[in-house]
Curated annotation (Swiss-Prot):
NCBIfam families: thrB
Record's subcellular location: Cytoplasm
Binding site for ATP: P84, L85, A86, R87, G88, M89, G90, S91, S92, S93, A94
Biological role: Catalyzes the ATP-dependent phosphorylation of L-homoserine to L-homoserine phosphate.
Family according to the record: Belongs to the GHMP kinase family. Homoserine kinase subfamily.
Gene3D superfamilies registered for this protein in UniProt: 3.30.230.10, GHMP kinase, C-terminal domain
The entry's keywords: Amino-acid biosynthesis, ATP-binding, Cytoplasm, Kinase, Nucleotide-binding, Threonine biosynthesis, Transferase
Name under which the protein is recorded: Homoserine kinase
Pathway(s) served: Amino-acid biosynthesis; L-threonine biosynthesis; L-threonine from L-aspartate: step 4/5
Residue ranges crossing the lipid bilayer per the database entry: none
Length: 292
């Protein structure tokens, strides 16, 4: 049987202070078409180059089927991916969520959205990209136990993304982190991560300027992304409500009020570089299906 087309959003993890705990979906979507076939097949268009049936969509599909106690049957998958690869915008999470969502759909919804989150988070290892890809908007998430809670979604805001032309592989970014951190730095981040749900719930978005600040990961990864800390400060000085590295980077994300993006775009142009690109995106929905 042919399935409706599946859409899974790009995501930003960490939001500065909420390392491995907070994330947000963007309105830029991986598109997937799939149907049972005599043998596995994978057709890919879009960012980067991905081929073969040993891909993350098929991996997520197989994991979802096995979580249901079902033997995966061959699946022909066609994917169009506009999400930049290895740039900190959740391309891997989108693919894994897509695969698990396919298994859920083909099983008649036996996993449910919560089950899709649990299986995909188990594969990804970090829930802060998976949770917004599943539930949309801003989300707070844990991996052990697997738990995700959507946060209020502000109106009238947009993300300005400065996407440099180079990649920062997640394993390399993880290696840059210290094994231990000072207690005062942990407290610094804990206090500011609590500001995210407080500011979103109260509508006091000016507090996000402080909520996005971080001492646990961005300063340690900065040598992998030349000029990133200065660019964050430049975006805030240009009027951004918040600015932070997306996931492991190198994408720098700045949240701005709609209509006030232009000075933020200018402030981030040097960091993006002449071969990079700027994206302006709204807050995205969790994965959804649409008849073609």
């Amino acid at each position: 049987m042919d399935l409706p087309r599946l859409y899974v959003p790009a995501t930003l993890a960490n939001l500065g202070s909420g390392f491995d705990a907070l994330g947000v979906a963007l309105d830029l979507y991986l598109e997937v078409e799939a149907h049972p076939a005599p043998e596995d097949a994978f057709l890919y268009e879009g960012e980067g180059h991905v081929e073969g049936t040993d891909n993350l969509i098929h991996e997520g599909y197989r994991a979802g089927m096995r979580a249901l106690g079902l033997e995966p049957f061959p699946l022909r998958v066609r994917a169009f991916n506009p999400i930049p690869l290895a740039r900190g915008m959740g391309s891997s999470s989108a693919a894994l969520v897509a695969g698990v969502a396919l298994a859920d759909r083909l099983s008649g919804g036996r996993l449910g959205r919560e089950g899709v989150f649990r299986v995909a988070a188990g594969l990804e290892g970090h829930p802060d990209n998976v949770a917004p890809a599943v539930f949309g908007g801003f989300v707070a998430a844990l991996s052990d136990p697997p738990l995700a809670i959507p946060l209020p979604r502000p109106e009238g805001v947009r993300f300005v993304l400065a996407v440099p032309p180079y990649e920062v592989p997640t394993p390399l970014a993880r290696e840059a982190l210290p094994r231990e951190v000072p207690l005062e730095d942990a407290i610094y981040n804990l206090a500011r991560s609590a500001l995210w749900p407080a500011a979103l719930s109260s509508g006091k978005l000016e507090a996000l300027r402080e909520a996005c600040r971080d001492r646990l990961h961005q300063p340690h990864r900065a040598p992998l992304m030349p000029g990133v800390l200065e660019a964050i400060e430049g975006a805030l000085e240009a009027g951004a409500l918040a600015a932070f590295v997306g996931g492991a980077g190198p994408t720098l994300a700045a949240l701005a009020r709609a209509g006030e993006e232009a000075p933020v775009i200018r402030a981030l142009s040097a960091y993006r570089g002449p071969e990079g690109r700027t994206l302006v995106l709204g807050i995205g929905e969790g994965y959804f299906w649409k008849e073609t």
